[in-house]
Amino acid sequence: MADITVVNDTGELYNVINQKKSEGYLESELTIISKSKLHLNDLHDSEISLISTSGTFSDRMTKLLTGEDGEHAVLSRYNLAPDELEKYKQLILDDKMLVVAVRDKSSHKEVQEHNSAYEEIDITHFAEASKGPKA
């Protein structure tokens, strides 16, 4: 279940991010949803997902032609009830930001155990095993 916090400005945004981290959320489990793109360099260099519902210029043109709703498309991935979805959609349209925290319940243990990139190989090479010239 998504834990959604409504934020009014960037100062409050940083406080909520720090609060979520203190609650045990990882940066990769946090998403910030806003109407327009956030120009916050320190967040661009983190694992926090930044999603703007307006999208790129081509996204806006596509929405104009297809009638698709960007806010609805972004919020639909969190399985919200219809009334909650409308409430959060309206908050985004009112230039509020949403901090969405979702626990990552997937396990990466199998990948780490069976991926050859994580194998520790002992490469010990002795001179007598070499077929080349001996010095």
Swiss-Prot record:
InterPro entries: GSP17M-like_dom. It comes from the Bacteria. Pfam families: YflT. Belongs to the UPF0355 family. This is UPF0355 protein SA0372. It comes from Staphylococcus aureus (strain N315).
